[in-house]
Amino acid sequence: MVTKEDLIAFEDDIANLFNGGKIKAPVHLSSGNEDHTIKAFENIKSNDWVCGAWRNHFMCLLKGVPKEDLKRRILNGKSMVMCIPEHRIICSSIVGGIPSIATGIAWAEKLKSEGNHVWCFVGDMSAATGAFSEAWRYSIVHNLPITWIIEDNGKSVETPTREMWGFRHPAATFDYIYEQSDGIVWDTPNKMIYYRYTNNKFPHAGAGMRVQF
């Protein structure tokens, strides 16, 4: 069983390796969302698919990827494009790139009728894109076996999501399903899980030191 302490220790290890010049490619590190991610994974089965973006180390560990295997892949420059089909993990480093892929996988699972589910992790800014909106609505209309997990840290890189989009009313964002501060919301009818978190430990990319590849 992977614990919160395991997740934190892994990212700290990767941060030290990156700052030491051992990783010759970008990394995106997580912090502050350990409890929420662990909670979401309580419902994810081994045969389910997990789809995500470039910040994916937590979900890989919780899906069962061995720590040393994941570390090897990161050292080989694969942090942003973690596709491990044997563990049913698919990631995309393109903003808004994963929703359509996840939707396609969900269609395939529905046709196979084997009871498997797709869980797609996206950030709040990605969830504000047309690509997400189309895939999310499509999955509801066709009742696909997929759940969208929106991880809201309030920004894209350093751009505040709500400011950037000019949101003035809570219904214009996912605030309308947010019921408690620093909580996690399960919106089953809309195939959605939503939570907020703050990452004050790591920058958007890298680990806080300028590293020349």
Predicted regions and their residues:
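Thiamine diphosphate
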Residues: H142-F213
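Phenylalanine-focused residue identity feature
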Residues: F10, F18, F41, F58, ...
